[in-house]
Amino acid sequence: IEISKVDFEVLSLRAPSLHPNNTGRQWYGLYPPNWDEADYEVNQLLLSLRKLDTYNISLKKTILLGFSQGGAMAIDVGCQLDIGLIVSCSGYPHLNWKPDEKCPPILISHGLMDEVVPISASKNIYQNIKSISKNFCVLNKFEGYHQIDPNFIEYVKLKIEELF
C-alpha cells in the first residue's frame, strides 16, 4: 500500500494455526466455531497489542485490519482498545462481542454475494456500532463474493491519510 502523507510501519500478526483445508491460517477452530478458543485468542491478541508502547508504537496510531475471521478478530479486539482505526473485510461479530460507545472509527466492507460469511454479519456490526458510538462507522457493500474489494482499499488509503 502506498500512502503519501503518512510514515508508518506494517506489523502483520499471523493466526496461530492452519485452516483445515490448507488455504490459509485461522485464529480458532471454525467448523464448528470454537468460541472458547476465540475468547482465548482475543485475550492473547489484546495482551500483545497492549505491549506495543514498549516498542514506541502508539495504539492511537495503530490500524487493525483483518479479512473474514481476521475481520472478526479486528472488530472484537479493536473495540476493546483505544486504537486509531479498525478495518474489517467480510468479518462477523464474535459470539460474546459487545461494542460500547468508545469503539474507535471502523471501516467495514462486505461482498453482497458472499456465501462464506453472509453480509448480514457486517450489517449487524454496523448497526450495533452506529447505535452506540459517536465515532464514524462506514459499511461498504460491493458486488462480489468472499473477497476484498480493491475500490475499498483505495478508500481505506484516503481515510488513513485523513486520520493520521
State what each model feature region is.
Residues 107-110, 114:
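Short beta-strand/loop motif that positions the catalytic acidic residue
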Residues 56-66:
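Alpha/beta-hydrolase fold nucleophile elbow
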